[in-house]
Amino acid sequence: MNKSYSLREIVSTLGGELLGKDDVLISRVASLANAQPGQISFLTDSKYRSVLATTNASAVILTPQNRDITALPRILTDNPYAYFAKVSDLLNPKPEYVAGVDDTAVIAPSAQVPASCTIMAKAVVGANVVLGEHVVVHPGCVIGEGVEIGAHSVLHANVTIYHHCMIGERCNIFSGSVIGGDGFGYAPEEGRWVKIPQVGRVVIEHDVDIGANTTIDRGAIDDTIIHEGCKIDNLVQIGHNCRIGAHSVIAGCVGIAGSAVLGKHCRIGGAAMILGHLEIADGVTVSPGSMITRSLMKAGTYTALMPFQSHDEWLRTAAGIRRLGELAERVKQLEKQLAPQQVSGIQRDK
């Protein structure tokens, strides 16, 4: 059951400026449209002002510029969305794990597992693994030989961490993810493929979240590196030798081919594709569904996707695109034909 906090307690803990009654109790967060008494919401987009006028929320979070748009008790802050996230975290504390090792877990004798760790049923911790304080390993996880995991990190059910990978502190890796499987490396020889041993690691720095069923391949020679603060959604594939810059976010179903390098604070929309060996500058946003086929050396938003149409309209558009080369050639020929006439006309004018 959620614990309730007064607005006064919330502001005392998280900061911000409080207007209105300070003893209002808040037990949950909610959207403006669905909020009920005892719940708090937020407003950042002016198009939802009409919803604010009819909300049943007991309080709202606003920017200082919007301080007078409602009579509801309100907390003023420069970033209402981030403040809302912090309130939600306050009202929904993380579960308290009981330290210890389940009887069905398998722990190698050489593994270093502090007494503060929680190792749940049927987890496997391999030889020479080093776990930090308060690491939580949920049921069915497999941690390979020589893996290091920093303090307060959590592996959810059925996560696999392959040998010698490194996970930083306060990381969350959700169910079904595989860290450090072999990269897709094969050399052609006489019509066959020769497997290239993948001898690098995956190195994940502090404060990284990795969604369910995401795969991050180990490097062929150099390490695959996910820098601090990155947030990666479900069903993402990151190829071998990639480097993802600090505090970048990658939405679901993205594929990043091997040896691509993303800068800091990049935003990659869902189902986007980034080809291998490309470099993406700091601060780049890639729109959902886009295919990036060349390096992007300047911050900004990039889109490589045809907007949707009805099927018949799309067929006509596609047919037109296929004819662009032909049309360009026809225009070029027409320009050549017109050029002598234009010169002749100029001479007559003289």
UniProtKB/Swiss-Prot annotation:
InterPro entries: Hexapep, Hexapep_transf_CS, LpxD, Trimer_LpxA-like_sf, UDP_GlcNAc_AcTrfase_non-rep. One of its GO terms (biological process) is lipid A biosynthetic process. It catalyses: a UDP-3-O-[(3R)-3-hydroxyacyl]-alpha-D-glucosamine + a (3R)-hydroxyacyl-[ACP] = a UDP-2-N,3-O-bis[(3R)-3-hydroxyacyl]-alpha-D-glucosamine + holo-[ACP] + H(+). It is an enzyme of class 2 (transferase). Pathway: Bacterial outer membrane biogenesis; LPS lipid A biosynthesis. Gene3D superfamilies: 1.20.5.170, Hexapeptide repeat proteins (2.160.10.10), MurE/MurF, N-terminal domain (3.40.1390.10). It comes from the Bacteria. The keyword Lipid biosynthesis applies. Its EC number is 2.3.1.191. Signal peptide: none annotated. The active site is at H240. The keyword Acyltransferase applies. SUPFAM superfamilies: Trimeric LpxA-like enzymes (SSF51161). PANTHER family: UDP-3-O-ACYLGLUCOSAMINE N-ACYLTRANSFERASE (PTHR43378), UDP-3-O-ACYLGLUCOSAMINE N-ACYLTRANSFERASE 1, MITOCHONDRIAL-RELATED (PTHR43378:SF2). Belongs to the transferase hexapeptide repeat family. LpxD subfamily. HAMAP family: LpxD. Homotrimer. This is UDP-3-O-acylglucosamine N-acyltransferase.
